[in-house]
Amino acid sequence: MTTPAYKRVLLKLSGEALMGDDPYGINRATIERMVADVSEVSRLGVELAIVIGGGNIFRGVAPGAEGMDRATADYMGMLATVMNSLALADAMRQVGITARVMSAIAIEQVVEPYVRPKALQYLEEGKIVVFAAGTGNPFFTTDTAAALRGAEIGAEIVLKATKVDGVYSADPNKDPDATRYSTITFDEAISKHLQVMDATAFALCRDQKLPIKVFSIVKPGALKRVVMGEDEGTLVHV
């Protein structure tokens, strides 16, 4: 296949993926490698939006959040995603990729607010859009934000980048007999109790008939192979 399989995609990155082998924070070499993968896909003409988590930063302050009100802790997590989004966008700009960070909570001196028509305009102009601050509401994960934004922008697929190269029948780190699914339906994943995304995000994707591709961001070239429609990771579909 010489042309990409998708025109517009939503890439979900976990904050933990930015840590590399560090205990928390942002590993510079890791983020530069991710940006190289992202820029390669962008240059193929694929319209790319990104939702990133905040676990790598929140992990460093988590002990101090014990006993904290859940909503307050969630807002702290949203701010962590803004920091990650700024770091990612800055790294992209340094390699000549135009990126725009749009936040679900107002921090107008730092990033612009999320406005759907503006996000669509940026994508059509070939810019990468990084959605920060989750959904802007506590009690919702960044997985749910990825499903929501993916549906809003009309993405053809949600690409969930993890440290594991797909969905397995069991934990491959614990069960040597665990097998990777190449494709699986939403209903099969539910019946087999496979953890693909949190329940809210998973239900939203299923209801909107928005497929999910789970793949390893650690594998070199995996993102490009996914976008080109090659057999990489696990496709979850209706």
Swiss-Prot record:
InterPro entries: AceGlu_kinase-like_sf, Asp/Glu/Uridylate_kinase, Uridylate_kinase, Uridylate_kinase_bac
Catalytic activity line of the entry: UMP + ATP = UDP + ADP
Keyword set includes Glycoprotein: no
EC number: 2.7.4.22
GO molecular function ontology, one term from the record: UMP kinase activity
Pathway membership: Pyrimidine metabolism; CTP biosynthesis via de novo pathway; UDP from UMP (UMPK route): step 1/1
The UniProt record lists the keyword Cytoplasm: yes
Entry keywords, A to Z: ATP-binding, Cytoplasm, Kinase, Nucleotide-binding, Pyrimidine biosynthesis, Transferase
Binding site for UMP: G54, D74, T135, G136, N137, P138, F139, F140, T141, T142
GO cellular component, one term: cytosol
Documented activity regulation: Inhibited by UTP.
Pfam families tied to this protein: AA_kinase
Record's subcellular location: Cytoplasm
Disulfide bonds: none
GO biological process terms on file: 'de novo' CTP biosynthetic process; UDP biosynthetic process
Record-listed ATP binding positions: K12, L13, S14, G15, G55, R59, T162, Y168, D171
Family: Belongs to the UMP kinase family.
Assembly, per entry: Homohexamer.
Protein's job: Catalyzes the reversible phosphorylation of UMP to UDP.
UniProt protein name: Uridylate kinase
Organism: Herminiimonas arsenicoxydans
